[in-house]
């Protein structure tokens, strides 16, 4: 999954905020992006997941992507999500459009993303991308 961090590094200017939505307890990509020099924030509806990220020195917010607090996302340069539930994908795309930033989704096998997203293969991982 660290290949996703490499892809974001190649595509997104390094002076910005990158937001992972639906982080859960998997922090490897967020940590790798921090190593690359990005300002990273994670978001999850699960308060325990956010507490875990903060404990690992990654800032986080509890937020619901279906009713997002746009203040969290306004300074973002990109949003990404790893294996989100299919019903969340459209909400992520709507959010990315509102704040006008690229969206990167690594799906579970067989999940169908919104039609507007383009499938790319980067170092063996499938990534759906939407760019404004």
Curated annotation (Swiss-Prot):
Domain of life assignment: Archaea
Residue pairs linked by disulfide bridges in the UniProt entry: none
Alphabetical list of Gene3D superfamilies matching this protein: Vaccinia Virus protein VP39
Signal sequence coordinates: none
Family as reported in the entry's similarity comment: Belongs to the UPF0146 family.
Record protein name field: UPF0146 protein PF0123
Species the sequence originates in: Pyrococcus furiosus (strain ATCC 43587 / DSM 3638 / JCM 8422 / Vc1)
